[in-house]
């Protein structure tokens, strides 16, 4: 018994002493261990975002269990039905996350659950669910698309008017993964608060096409026999404004609903650029370059119809207000068109209807005041009304800057904001020169100070741009589009080691690599004798999926190294972000990469 016990102790000691040498013999010469270790920090997408779904009659339930240290982008979640119609649903509010390259975005952590009503589903109906997320450690997964088969759902007679909703969300059955080409975030809310529409409406009321008409409109509202009760006058004025607000609200809902059906397409760079051009043209009409309004024949017909209503009655006044919303003057057409275009681009029905309602309410507040108190509180007409109109031209010009910022990035976005601010303060300063009051001199000094402050980004661009460009020299990569092209380049590498950078616009850490790591002088010198390739897999199409699957790439950033014979040096693979010092150390520890 004692002998067996001693033998057991000796065996245990041998096991405890063995691991170091055993590990050396097992993995010391195995190059694939390095690649496996480089990816061990990150888990497969199915584990990072564990997805489950089930259908209960006319309801589809989607849920995600998000691994600690990982997150999903709210704006990247999309749901598209095929041969089915979905009822209205909304994504829950996410956690605000600041991104250096994309600004403020919303993300989901830990868990996400969606309940989506199904109004109709034919045989072989399905729902495509797309999502995309990242690891907090600096690693992003390509957009994932899953196809969920649906059971048949017969449309109810009461739901015949329900429209299909193409929205956004997530799924993960591994057998039906499909690459998704469009991964552009779709904003679900307006960057402008709808309350701004109230202020814009009040401001539009003081333009030369609107303010002089208010005394006439108030007389029409009250009718031939002016009511003696102030309460009655207030009710009539408010009813008129509500009629006008109804028209604008319906316009907002219709335009937002139309935009919702094409929400993803409206985020395409070409569409954003086209909308920006339209906004600029609308702004030019506010500066007096041309007049924009409804055809005169249509305006005349609407005016006659409005005049046929009986003033002084609630129904007649409400109808006049509703028709007045359709009669756009040159001062109101451009702002209204700009708001409608922007609402269509956002696709948010609640914000769309609310924004137009507040806009009409803002225009109606001065009218209510005029109707109650007469012309006493109306400012005297003059050139200042034209200046108000021109000021709203600058407000409209802010919209294309918002849209172009998504296409051009933060750097050029800041320059566009600076250019717009310089134009506005310069215009205000020139106007102030026409006044001679003493307090205007103080305003002029403030305007000049503001002009210098807002011009700073343009100054940096003009005077420091060349210096910064010379100081920060980015690596010039040779692009490769697919696996056959990569194999051809490797075959013609002429004995040089090769580095392949897998890049995508939706990969935040890829942009960090470009900005902080590849721009480093020491890193560039270390890679001087290396053939540098880059594959842009932003579109995530079939060719890109083939390339990523060939090298078992989980996500980005991933950097592959190949020796002079075109074989991957798996131990040198980089997965996840490395700063310049870490990447340089990695290169120096792998002599075969940069020999």
Curated annotation (Swiss-Prot):
The keyword Cell inner membrane applies. Residues 166-186 are annotated as: Disordered. Its main location: membrane. Keywords: Cell inner membrane, Cell membrane, Cytochrome c-type biogenesis, Disulfide bond, Electron transport, Membrane, NAD, Oxidoreductase, Redox-active center, Signal, Transmembrane, Transmembrane helix, Transport. One of its GO terms (molecular function) is electron transfer activity. Its EC number is 1.8.1.8. It is an enzyme of class 1 (oxidoreductase). GO terms for cellular component: plasma membrane. It is a multi-pass membrane protein. It catalyses: [protein]-dithiol + NAD(+) = [protein]-disulfide + NADH + H(+); [protein]-dithiol + NADP(+) = [protein]-disulfide + NADPH + H(+). InterPro entries: Cyt_c_assmbl_TM_dom, DsbD_gamma, DsbDN, DsbDN_sf, Thiol_diS_interchange_DbsD, Thioredoxin-like_fold, Thioredoxin-like_sf, Thioredoxin_CS. GO terms for biological process: cell redox homeostasis; cytochrome complex assembly. It is found in: Cell inner membrane. It comes from the Bacteria. The chain crosses the membrane at residues 197-217, 233-253, 270-290, 311-331, 332-352, 353-373, 384-404, 411-431, 435-455. Required to facilitate the formation of correct disulfide bonds in some periplasmic proteins and for the assembly of the periplasmic c-type cytochromes. Acts by transferring electrons from cytoplasmic thioredoxin to the periplasm. This transfer involves a cascade of disulfide bond formation and reduction steps. Belongs to the thioredoxin family. DsbD subfamily. This is Thiol:disulfide interchange protein DsbD. The lineage of its organism: Bacteria, Pseudomonadati, Pseudomonadota, Gammaproteobacteria, Enterobacterales.
């Amino acid at each position: 018994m004692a002998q067996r016990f001693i033998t057991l102790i000796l065996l245990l000691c041998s096991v405890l002493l063995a691991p170091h040498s055993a590990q050396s013999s097992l993995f010391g010469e195995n190059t694939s261990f390095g690649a496996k270790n480089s990816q061990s920090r990150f888990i497969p997408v199915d584990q990072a975002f564990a997805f489950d779904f089930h259908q209960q009659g006319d309801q589809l339930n989607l849920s995600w269990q998000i691994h600690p240290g990982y997150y999903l982008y709210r704006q990247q979640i999309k749901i598209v039905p095929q041969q089915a119609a979905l009822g209205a649903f909304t994504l829950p509010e996410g956690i605000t996350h600041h991104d250096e390259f994309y600004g403020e975005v919303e993300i989901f952590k830990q868990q996400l659950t969606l309940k989506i009503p199904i109004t109709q589903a034919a045989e072989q109906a399905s729902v495509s669910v797309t999502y995309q997320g990242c690891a907090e450690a600096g690693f992003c997964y390509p957009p994932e698309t899953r196809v969920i088969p649906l059971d048949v759902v017969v449309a109810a007679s009461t739901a015949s008017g329900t429209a299909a909703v193409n929205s956004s969300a997530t799924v993960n059955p591994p057998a039906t993964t499909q690459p998704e080409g469009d991964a552009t975030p779709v904003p679900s809310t307006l960057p402008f608060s709808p309350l701004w529409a109230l202020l814009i409406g009040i401001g539009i009321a003081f333009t030369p096409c609107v303010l002089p008409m208010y005394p006439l409109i108030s007389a029409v509202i009250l009718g031939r026999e002016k009511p003696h009760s102030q309460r009655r006058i207030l009710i009539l004025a408010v009813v008129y404004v509500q009629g006008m607000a109804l028209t604008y609200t319906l316009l907002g809902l219709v335009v937002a609903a139309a935009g919702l059906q094409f929400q993803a397409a409206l985020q395409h760079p070409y569409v954003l650029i086209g909308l920006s051009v339209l906004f600029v043209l609308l702004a030019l009409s506010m500066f007096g370059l041309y007049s924009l309004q409804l055809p005169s024949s249509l305006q005349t017909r609407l005016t006659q119809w409005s005049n046929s209503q009986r003033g002084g009655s609630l129904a007649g006044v409400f109808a006049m207000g509703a028709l007045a919303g359709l009669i756009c003057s040159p001062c109101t057409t451009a702002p209204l068109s700009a708001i409608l275009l922007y609402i269509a681009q956002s696709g948010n029905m609640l914000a769309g209807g609310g924004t137009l309602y507040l806009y009409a309410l803002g225009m109606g507040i001065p009218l209510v005041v005029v109707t109650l108190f007469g012309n006493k509180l109306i400012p005297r007409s003059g050139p200042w009304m034209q200046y108000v109109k021109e000021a709203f031209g600058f407000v409209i010009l802010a919209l294309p800057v918002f849209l172009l910022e998504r296409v051009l990035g933060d750097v050029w976005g800041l320059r566009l904001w600076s250019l717009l601010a310089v134009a506005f303060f310069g215009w205000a300063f020139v106007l102030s020169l026409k006044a001679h009051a003493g307090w205007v001199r103080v305003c002029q000094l403030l305007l000049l100070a503001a002009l210098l402050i807002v011009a700073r980004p343009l100054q940096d661009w003009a005077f420091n741009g060349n210096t910064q460009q010379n100081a920060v020299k980015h690596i010039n990569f040779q692009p490769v589009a697919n696996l056959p092209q990569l194999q051809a380049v490797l075959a013609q590498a002429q004995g040089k080691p090769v580095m392949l950078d897998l890049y995508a616009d939706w990969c935040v850490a890829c942009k960090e690599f470009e900005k902080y790591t590849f721009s480093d002088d020491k890193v560039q010198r270390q890679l001087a004798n290396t053939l540098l390739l880059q594959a842009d897999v932003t579109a995530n199409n079939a060719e890109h999926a083939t390339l990523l699957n060939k090298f078992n790439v989980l996500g980005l950033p991933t950097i592959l190294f190949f020796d002079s014979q075109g074989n991957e040096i798996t131990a040198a693979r980089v997965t996840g972000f490395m700063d310049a010092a870490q990447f340089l150390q990695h290169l120096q520890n792998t002599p075969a990469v940069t020999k």
